[in-house]
Amino acid sequence: MNDISTIFKEKKLKLTPQRIAVYKYLKSTHEHPSAETIYKAIQSDYPTMSLATVYKALKTLAEVHLIQELNVGEGNFRYDANSSSHPHIQCLSCGKVDDIMGITFDNLNKDVSSHTDYDVISNKLYFYGICKDCKDKA
């Protein structure tokens, strides 16, 4: 939890129990939960916390780069505590989102820069397919 304390102190932001709870939950899972899923998971420990508070905490955590906000389409967002640059794959059947680790963007960033008049600052790469569980059910 040192990283969140340090970052919030540097940014002069208030570190609330709600923000800590949301961050801890995200750090404890390899899933990419929605705000609603996070809310339901921590509601028993924080019964007075609203869904709006969870959304605000997620927005702040994303703004300080402690988490990633993943736009999985149609206004549907998921959240990832692994803030390093990495691609994701989403199941088109069940909506599950997984990390794809071990792929670097170095060459892709250079190629994009050399083919455009842009300096690449960041990127997000998504793949779509059918997960093993859904294939096994078919």
From Swiss-Prot:
Gene Ontology molecular function: any one: transcription cis-regulatory region binding
Keyword presence, Translocase: no
Keywords: Detoxification, DNA-binding, Metal-binding, Repressor, Transcription, Transcription regulation, Zinc
Keyword Aminoacyl-tRNA synthetase among record annotations: no
Entry binding sites for Zn(2+): 91, 94, 131, 134
Membership in a protein family: Belongs to the Fur family.
Protein name: Transcriptional regulator PerR
Organism: Clostridium acetobutylicum (strain ATCC 824 / DSM 792 / JCM 1419 / IAM 19013 / LMG 5710 / NBRC 13948 / NRRL B-527 / VKM B-1787 / 2291 / W)
Gene name, Swiss-Prot/TrEMBL: perR
